[in-house]
Amino acid sequence: EEYRKKFEFEGSFYVDLDFKHHYVGVFKYIHRGVEFYFLDNEDYFNRDNVYGENDDCERFVFFSKACVQLLRYIDFDCDIIHSNDWHTAMVNVYARDFAKGDPFYESIKTVFTIHNLKYQGVFSSNSLRQTDLSPMYFSEDALKFYDAINFMKGAIVFSDKVTTVSKNYADEIKYSFFGEGLDGVIRQYHYKISGITNGIDTTIWNPEKDKYLFKNYSLKNIKDKSVNKKALQRMYGLEEKDVPIFAMVTRLVENKGLELVRYIMDEFLTTEDVQVIILGTGDYSYEEMFKYYEWKFPDKLKANIYYNNEESHKIYAGADFLMMPSIFEPCGISQLIAMRYGTIPVVRETGGLRDTVQSFNEFSKEGNGFSFTNINAHDFLYTLRRAISFYYNDDFKIIQENAMKSKNDWEKSAKEYIQLYEEIIK
């Protein structure tokens, strides 16, 4: 609301969809020298939810077409359009369609980033009329997906370049297990698909200046991390003792590996002197699972079935280990944040977890976490126990330091995106 008051009204235009004229209000805001444009339509945008509405197809088609028309309205000489996920996938489709009959759009190149292939924007074949595109787009080499239309498929087909949010995920989605029904399309267009690993905002996630911590610390005084650990134990009513704390800050859904957690948690808490802290919401069965373990092991596990940003900062700073046994993970942000705070990730080697976490080698002293390969609960349990074994020796500090030295900001990723942009506008 603070920024909205500073928006400048630039004018309006209309978008034609399904034989209707739809109003588009245009607002501009300049922030740190960058011009931002905002599109307004009360019917489509004045909702309680960004998505999850019954008319999502029509809403996002409208937004996508309006974005492309905006370029001509403001007379912006655009080199590259970069869209993300199914919600704006149709931007790239419209850009290609407009280029067929309008020289203004002919030289524009397009990039599309897949953050999670699971969510594709699939709608009934009848929805094609809402797009105002030719029936020719209902074909195997365009939007057709079985007897439906698929926005994400359209972007993969019509974009000049496609990226995923990690290099390993770009390889994984070529196979049916990870491909979510689009693996054939991914293999067909593999030549234009690459992975660029996400980073984190290190100004927000900075243990040296984080306002939410009980005590700030850095690589130079990592011993002060223990102050946060003790305060975290007090905050959640856990005994203040020197045992490893394992945390999960996550959505409680199946792809986060929670079936593996379900299978081993009872044995883990029965046999190991540890404490576990959970923060997150999700599927009812997993919420109840952690409530049950909290009831059974009240002195060992604290289940916080909600999300709170301030508490997440405190957990990242106070925990010793972060558990991420994901079945698939396009990039993963939690492990990057955890390492920034010297909290050691224990992960399954998939997607971005494989790219960013290297299992510790006790001989070379290299590695910033612990990992396992197979989707196997006892492999996970073995890895947790291996992590515990290092907690009690001098190598633990080395692993913490390796984690905090890991470079997970946006600098490297930004350079890779710039390189990609330069390649396609040569």
Residue ranges and their predicted role:
Residues 1-426:
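Catalytic cores of nucleotide-sugar-dependent glycosyltransferases that transfer UDP/GDP/TDP-activated
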